[in-house]
């Protein structure tokens, strides 16, 4: 089992997330894993608003269609990578204007898992 803490910025609490190691299908560094609560709809329907994502700070290798946590303009964003255009973009058509060139951003981590509260 893996247990991670994350900050619920909506309720101003620290929460715990427990999940089986078997859920992660990609190589990862357990000491570099962290969880973050999503605030936004730009990656819906793949990642819902207020979902919890697990990301690996040690994994910044870009792969086509990979989902990454990136830093741009003093904010953190979750975006999909397009290797042909060398850009990061939102998958929700309502946010299609959110496109960032690789040289404009800092790659923070690769998103490995998403948990959605139903």
Question: Where does each model-flagged region fall?
Answer:
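Glycine- and charge-enriched low-complexity intrinsically disordered segments
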Residues: 83-118
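Short coil-to-beta-strand transition motifs
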Residues: 47, 74-77, 103-106
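Structural motif
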Residues: 51-52, 66
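Short, compositionally biased
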Residues: 65-77, 82-86
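Short, positionally conserved secondary-structure boundary motifs
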Residues: 1-49, 59-61, 115-118
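Short aromatic/hydrophobic contact patches that present stacked aromatics
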Residues: 35-37, 54, 69
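Short Gly/Pro-enriched loop/turn and capping motifs at secondary-structure junctions
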Residues: 60, 74-76, 95
